[in-house]
């Protein structure tokens, strides 16, 4: 693997992720077993020397990152908070101070998109957290992405004005998104993606584009946790 556990810790990999990945290298049937036993961890696996590869194995960082995303996405917000702040305290003290200034606020951020059948898998290593969630903190907010020039400034400004005028903190997700769809339709953007895909030339864009305008304005990024 070319590195010891301290190196992987410094890079931000959780020990659980590294151990999980190593098991996929050591025993050819580990992944199949884990799919059949999703609630168990590598310590429960019936390891067999007979299942070890006789030709050795190649380390693959891409596969490690995939495994790590699965591991971190399956953690609770509390577990992610503990792992992230523990890593940051040693390797990014300034970030650790921001994270721990208001633990409940940080945990509420980490809870976004977590749980359910399809949890978000944005984090592969703890060091991914700052660029991913930094916009929630004044110290780290920065506009890193811009709205493509193919969209008119007038449309963008109209969307943002409409969003501000209609925003109500008490709205649930469905009401919130319905308002965005109405803004889109009023400006000639398709409110329904199926309708847009069937005849894209009939619209100025889609509700996905309108949502992107809002996302970039609020977060400075094209990719972020769920805006709602």
What are these regions (language model features)?
Residues 17, 63, 80, 176, ...:
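Residue-level detector of well-ordered alpha-helical segments, enriched
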Residues 99-184, 190-193:
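Charged, gly/pro-rich, cysteine-poor intrinsically disordered low-complexity regions
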Residues 178-228:
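Charged substrate- and nucleic-acid-binding regions of tRNA-handling and nucleotidyl-transfer enzymes
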Residues 1-142, 219-228:
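Catalytic adenosine-cofactor/nucleotide-binding cores of aminoacyl-tRNA synthetases and other
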Residues 8-15, 74-78, 150-153, 157, ...:
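Generic detection of long, well-ordered alpha-helical segments
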Residues 47-54, 143-148, 166-167, 206-213:
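Short, functional N-terminal and low-complexity linear motifs
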Residues 5-6, 65-68, 85, 161-164, ...:
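Amphipathic alpha-helical segments within well-ordered protein domains
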Residues 4, 48, 60, 125, ...:
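A diffuse structural propensity rather than consistent per-protein peaks
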């Amino acid at each position: 693997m070319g590195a010891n556990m301290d190196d992987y810790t410094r890079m931000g990999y959780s020990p659980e992720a590294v151990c999980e990945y190593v098991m996929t290298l050591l025993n050819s049937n580990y992944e199949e077993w884990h799919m059949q036993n999703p609630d168990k961890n590598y310590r429960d696996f019936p390891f067999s020397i007979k299942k070890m590869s006789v030709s050795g194995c190649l380390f693959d960082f891409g596969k490690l990152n995939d495994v790590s995303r699965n591991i971190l996405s399956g953690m609770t917000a509390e577990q992610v908070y503990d792992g992230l702040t523990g890593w940051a305290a040693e390797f990014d003290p300034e970030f650790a101070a921001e994270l721990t200034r208001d633990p409940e606020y940080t945990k509420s951020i980490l809870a976004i998109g977590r749980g359910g059948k399809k949890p978000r898998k944005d984090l592969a290593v703890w060091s991914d957290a700052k660029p991913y969630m930094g916009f929630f903190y004044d110290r780290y907010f920065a506009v890193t992405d811009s709205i493509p020039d193919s969209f008119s400034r007038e449309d963008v400004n109209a969307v943002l004005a409409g969003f501000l005028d209609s925003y109500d903190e008490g709205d649930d997700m469905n009401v919130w998104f319905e308002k965005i769809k109405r803004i889109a339709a009023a400006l000639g953007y398709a409110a329904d993606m199926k309708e847009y895909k069937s005849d894209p030339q009939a619209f100025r864009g889609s509700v996905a584009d309108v949502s992107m305008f809002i996302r970039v304005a609020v977060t400075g990024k094209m990719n972020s946790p769920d805006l709602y």
